[in-house]
Structures are given as C-alpha cells and as structure tokens.
Amino acid sequence: MLSAKGYLYAPRDARATVSLTRRDPRETRLGLQLFGREPDLIARAAAELSDKGFAFIDLNMGCPAPKITGNGEGSALMREPELAQAVAAAAVRATHLPVTVKIRAGWDSATAPELARRLQDAGVRAIAVHARTRMQFYSGKADWSVIQAVKRAVSLPVIGNGDIVDGESAARMLEETGCDGLMVARAAQGNPWIFAQIRAHLRGEPWNAPSVEERVCTALRHLDMQIALDGEEHAVREMRKHIAWYVSGLRGSARLREKINALPRAQQVRDCLLEYAAQL
C-alpha cells in the first residue's frame, strides 16, 4: 500500500518508496495499491506508475488504521462517497491499466452497496469488499450479506474478503454471496498453503497439511527472499513476526519466538530454526 502523496513528494530513492514499488521478475500479474484522498495526486501517481510493469492499479478505501483514516484516507473515504467516486474517476482517467478498489462494509454501518454503484460509474473494473465496518477493525464476525448486497448492486466482478480461513469457509462465501472471487488476508500469515488448501477443497481434491519440516523450510526461504529485498538487518527484524506465524501452534513455539527476537544475524536465525525443527 503506497501513499500517492508520499510517492510524489518523497525522494525517489527513499527506502519505503523503493521497496513498495519493487517487483520480482516472476510476478507477472502484480497490482500496485495506492491510497490518498486528493484526486489530482492519485491521478498523477497512477499515471507515473502505469509503465512500471504492474498489471493493474488498486485503490485502498478500506484501511482502518488511525494513522490513515486520521488524514481522511483509507476507509475514511467511505464517509465521503462523492469524493471517493472522484478519486476513483481520476485514477481511471489517468492510466491505461485496469483500476480496482478495495472497500469495507462501511464506516459504522453497511454503506458499501451505494459506494460500489458510484465506483462502477467512475469506471473501476472490480471491487473487493471486506465485510466488516471500519469501526469493527478486525474484530467480530464479517457480515457476508454485505458482499451479497454489493454483488447485487453492480455488474462488476466482486471479490469477497473477511473470515476466509480454510477451504470450507471459502466455499461457503462463494455459495452464500455469489461473489466472483476470494481475497485471503490474515489467514495467510505464516500459512501460504491456504491457497492450495482452498483450491483443493473447491475441486474436491485431497490436501495434506504441511509438516513441521516444510513450515521451517518455507520460513527459511522467506528469510532469504526478504534479505534479497531489504538487506540482512532489516530482513531479520521483519521476519520475527513472520516466523512466529509460521510456527504458531507448534510445541515450543513460544520459546522459539523469544530466541528469534533476540538474534541480530540471519545465520543465527537459520541455525535456531533448524535446531528447533530437529527437536520436534
């Protein structure tokens, strides 16, 4: 998620700007998500980023973080539907790429269908709906009926998000809402296998959960990729939370987290993970 204002006014070699716009050559269908509330800045950023190899531009109108909504950005735009429509229309006019939008159910009530119609009029190509209001943040139960209402309100592809945790819940969302696609968020933290699990469930195929060895090997691969992206020092700090997610629920994971959080070097992290796996 990249701030349009930050992208336009921060030094182009700033660490955050560089890392948020970097792509792996193997990522051929990667979108770039922008956020902001000024239509002209969104348009300028979308135009400048259109030739960077991304497949589409996504506008974030769903982020609930106070540091974002406090500036009237993210899900705060759901309280200003006319401005949200203007932001989307500006992006659509500025780029040859498809423009999509991520929204929530609403700010404190379900206003998503009304906003979705405005976004459709603005020319966006798809809408993703997190079925919680901003006031819920990530608590409580996602109201999937909002996704269904958005699907009925527009003729665009609608992507459902919220409380998809496994293959069974993915299938239920598709059936109950009629949505065209699924978005998995927190359930993928430390669990990249969830996508294979969902695919297998929808196809009626068997699926085997990853072994401890596979979890650890994947965490190590993730560490190496993070180092290649950010350098060792930053990667080691960033990976602490990811490793905690990878080993969540395993015996001795709390003690492992304590050890990992105290290690400053990548090789120390590798050795610690391998030793942990060997003891299970």
Protein language model regions, located:
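Alpha/beta catalytic cores of nucleotide-metabolism and tRNA/nucleoside-modifying enzymes
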Residues: 94-96, 109-126, 145, 149-160, ...
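Short, surface-exposed acidic/glycine-rich loop or hinge patches that mediate macromolecular interfaces
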Residues: 36-39, 62, 106, 163-164, ...
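Hydrophobic alpha-helical membrane-association signature
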Residues: 80-83, 87, 218-219, 239
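Short secondary-structure boundary segments
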Residues: 1, 5, 61, 131, ...
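Alpha/beta enzyme core
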Residues: 40-57, 61-73, 81-156
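Hydrophobic faces of well-ordered beta-strands that scaffold small-molecule active sites
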Residues: 28-34, 57, 99-103, 129, ...
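Pocket-edge positions in alpha/beta enzyme catalytic cores
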Residues: 34, 75-76, 139, 207, ...
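Glycine-rich, positively charged N-terminal anion/phosphate-binding segment
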Residues: 1-51
